[in-house]
Amino acid sequence: MFGNDVSRAAREHALSEWPRESCGVVSGGVYHPILNIAANPLNGFEIDARVWLDHAPEAVIHSHDASTVTGADGRPRPRHPHHPSRADMASQIAAGVPFGIVSTDGEAVSDVLWWGDHVLSEPLEGRTFLPGVRDCYALVRAWYFQRRGVMLADFARDDGWWSAGENMLVDGFAEAGFVPVDGPLQEGDVFFARAGSPVPSHSGVVLDGGLILHHHTGLSGCEPLGRWLHRITHWVRHAP
């Protein structure tokens, strides 16, 4: 998205700030390190509002601590995963510019993971699953953007939101411009389905020929609708 100099500078900044989260902005094609003013910089970042006036950021990059901890299941995991949190997503949606994450354990450091509305233009099939970036709802948004020229609302979300008492798809479909389907299905209709979850946690788009486009795990792609009928709980249609 930006040149190697931006990536290199952001990665070096992340290493120098670890275990605190680093943050910076890209302005004029150059990475500018910014002071993280969050109350708890080990677990989040905050940028002074004046930065937006001084730099007119084209993008924001921050770091995640990838050092190994023991999860609730007793297995090792990174302290913060290499994908955006709900707070990260909310900040990106509000800012309206691309955001990036670099993950480091203080020694190794990842490449920049970019996300934002530019992902809408990526190919619809063959996407690698990544929570909040390339997941089922992200694919629905991308299909509507590419095939209908419609920009659906995005929703900040944590991985596993469905197991935390939330019902994002059902609660949010009206805000995204959808209404319940009454009648035969049409191309572009969207389904909600339970995928081993107490509430609908998966969505996809109906295509012609009895197919659906969806992104459950692995790579996004098409498959026959019939394979998912027993899991589907809702059908909705976009109402321009």
List where the protein language model places each region.
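Second-shell loop/turn segments in exported
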Residues: L124-L130
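Generic beta-sheet signal
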Residues: G100-V102, H215, H238
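Conserved beta-strand-loop surface patch within small alpha/beta domains used
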Residues: M1-E58, A66-G116
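...with weaker cross-activation on analogous glycine-rich loops/strands in unrelated enzymes
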Residues: D159-G226
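Active-site nucleophilic cysteine motif
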Residues: L130-R147
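Extracytoplasmic and endomembrane cell-envelope/extracellular-matrix remodeling and assembly machinery
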Residues: V119-L120
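Short acidic alpha-helical/loop segments enriched in Asp/Glu that coordinate divalent cations
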Residues: V150-W161
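Glycine- and charge-enriched low-complexity intrinsically disordered segments
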Residues: P224-P240
